[in-house]
Amino acid sequence: MIKFNIFFNGQLFVSNELNFFIQTNQSKILFVFHGLYGRARNWQSMAKKLSLDGSIIVISVDLRNHGENLFDEDHSYSLMMEDIIKLFNYLNIKKTNLLGHSMGGKLAMLLSLTYPEFVNKLIIADIAPIDYQDDEGEIINSLLDLDLNLIQSRNDADKILSIKIVDKSLRMFLLQNLQLVNGRYEWGVNLKVIKKSMNNLKSFPILNEVKKNNQEALCIYGANSKYVTNTNLVSFKKYFANISFKKIEGAGHWLHVEKPELFFETISIFLNN
């Protein structure tokens, strides 16, 4: 079963204590899907804050080949959708809200378009429903080239990665996946499978005959991001008839980390409106 964390009243629940509440308050549930190289834990502080007043239950999910999930030999949006639908069925979710960042944002959009009956409101964080041509190869090759047998600490890894990955904040984010297991460092993300699946992850694999979605949707994006721009904003209208946009000044792709207060305020207003 896919790994997930439940936050309510600012607290983390790891059992079925909230099952009854989940069944009777589904319009107040928000599922959060992280981006590539991310994990549910990255969203812990935001999830706690969103759930603090008791009006929202936040369920943050480790997507396949990331975080605490078991590694699998395949990775695609269709498989991730299957994982999430299985989770919905396990929790007896009939209708819910979705928030996805980057890869998780594409997953949330695809779920909303493919299984609209499950989705109440949709929040997309800094990704567009398009095929991206950007070459992510340098990042994943740098991680795969790192000889973990020579690594004694995260600082060692950071020094080596800094030769090819100049952005320190990006390195710090990536190195969150480096974990010490039985005295040896290992990656907490299935890099080989991710590399093999990169073409699928850069695409937006939706069927042409999909119906335009009328659900209430919000795209929140960083003014300094290369992923959502004035040029590709029009792509959302092809799929989402009822979408609004919020640009966060001074933020890039990791807008929820760079401008957490404004990000929190924006999605809180949207969910509670």
Positions of the model-derived regions?
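Alpha/beta-hydrolase fold catalytic core
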Residues: 1-31, 52-56, 93-94, 271-273
